[in-house]
Amino acid sequence: MRKMLAAVSRVLSGASQKPASRVLVASRNFANDATFEIKKCDLHRLEEGPPVTTVLTREDGLKYYRMMQTVRRMELKADQLYKQKIIRGFCHLCDGQEACCVGLEAGINPTDHLITAYRAHGFTFTRGLSVREILAELTGRKGGCAKGKGGSMHMYAKNFYGGNGIVGAQVPLGAGIALACKYNGKDEVCLTLYGDGAANQGQIFEAYNMAALWKLPCIFICENNRYGMGTSVERAAASTDYYKRGDFIPGLRVDGMDILCVREATRFAAAYCRSGKGPILMELQTYRYHGHSMSDPGVSYRTREEIQEVRSKSDPIMLLKDRMVNSNLASVEELKEIDVEVRKEIEDAAQFATADPEPPLEELGYHIYSSDPPFEVRGANQWIKFKSVS
C-alpha cells in the first residue's frame, strides 16, 4: 500500500512541475479541421475563380502559424542586427507580408519553381532554407546560404532562383524557367514575383507576351504592397488593377493578408497552368510594415496611423490565430508555446550568424560555376583558378 501511494505521489509531483499551459494543451481535445469563408477574388478573363470556402486542418494551421511567426521574428531580428551595424548594405524586410510567402508555398509543390525580387528573406525560408543560413547570409558569414557573398538581395535554394537586385529583371527569367519546364515535359510551374513598383517596367510586358504566345506554365505574381519605394500606387500607375495588366492573360486579385486566400488562389492558378492553358496573373494585395529598405523610415509618405490601422485590422498572423482559436483548432496557450520556441530558434540563429567566420578573401571568385572550370581566369591578382566549392 505504501509503495502504491509513493508511486501516485511521484506521478502527481511530476505533473505539478510541468508548465500549466502544457498540461492544458495535452489534455484538451481539438478539432481536426474547420471550414472557413474567404474573400472572393476579383477576376479578369476567367469565368470562375478559386473557391470562397476552404478547409484548414489543425496540422496545416499550426504549420502555417509557425512559419509566419518565424518569418516575422527573423525580419525583426534582421532589423535589430542592421541597427547594430552587424548587417550592412541593402536590406529589404517583408514583415506584414508573411501570408504571401507562406501561402504561395502552401499552394505549390516542392518541385515547382519560384523567382522573386530583392525582398526575398521570407521566400528563402519557405523554400526550405534555415533561419541560420539566412541570417548568416545577411551578416556576410561563411555559413550563409550564398557563402556570405550574396547578402539580403541574393539568396538561393533548390528551385529558388533569388533574390534579384534589378527592378523587374527577374520576370523574363521566370518566363524562361517556365519555358524550361515545358520544353523538358515536366509538370511544373514557375511563380514569378515582382512588386507594384516594377509592374510598370517594359520588360514585364514583353515577358507576358512571350509566355502567352508559347503557353508557358508561368504564374506572374504582383505583390502590391501599395508603395513603390516612397511612391503610392495611385501616383505611379494610371490603372492600379494590376491583375488586368496582362490584357490577354487571365488574372485574379487576391487578399494577400489572408493566408487561406493566397493558398487557394495559388492552387487555382497552378492547376490552370498545369492544364496547358498558359500563363495566369495574380495580384496579391498586401502591406509592408517596414519602409522600402532599412534606409527608409517609412513614415514620410504614409502616416503612422495608417500602419497601425493595418496592423490592428489586417495582420496576417493575428487573422490566422483568431481563426484557429475560435474554431478550436488550437489554444492561446499552445500558440504561445510556438512563439517561445520560434524566439529561441531566432536567437540561436542570430548567435551563429554573429560568431560564424567571414569567408576568406581568396574565395571571392568561388561559387560562380556549378562545377570546377577546367581553366584559369586572370583576376585582379595573378592567374587564379576559380572553384565551385570551398
From Swiss-Prot:
Instruction: Share an example GO biological-process annotation for this protein.
Output: pyruvate decarboxylation to acetyl-CoA
Q: List residues modified as Phosphotyrosine.
A: Y301
Is the keyword Phosphoprotein in the record? yes
> Which top EC class is named for this enzyme in its record?
oxidoreductase
One of the entry's Gene Ontology molecular-function terms is: pyruvate dehydrogenase (acetyl-transferring) activity
What controls its activity?
Answer: Pyruvate dehydrogenase activity is inhibited by phosphorylation of PDHA1; it is reactivated by dephosphorylation.
Alphabetical list of CDD domains matching this protein: TPP_E1_PDC_ADC_BCADC (cd02000)
Listed GO cellular component terms?
mitochondrial matrix; mitochondrion; nucleolus; nucleus; pyruvate dehydrogenase complex
Spell out the reaction equation it catalyses. Answer: N(6)-[(R)-lipoyl]-L-lysyl-[protein] + pyruvate + H(+) = N(6)-[(R)-S(8)-acetyldihydrolipoyl]-L-lysyl-[protein] + CO2
Keywords assigned by UniProt?
Answer: Acetylation, Carbohydrate metabolism, Disease variant, Glucose metabolism, Leigh syndrome, Magnesium, Metal-binding, Mitochondrion, Oxidoreductase, Phosphoprotein, Primary mitochondrial disease, Pyruvate, Thiamine pyrophosphate, Transit peptide, Tricarboxylic acid cycle
Effect annotated for changing R302C:
In PDHAD; loss of activity; common mutation
Predominant cellular place of this UniProt entry's protein: mitochondrion
Cofactor(s) recorded for this entry are: thiamine diphosphate; Mg(2+)
Provide the protein name.
Answer: Pyruvate dehydrogenase E1 component subunit alpha, somatic form, mitochondrial
Species whose genome carries this gene? Homo sapiens (Human)
What gene is behind this protein? PDHA1
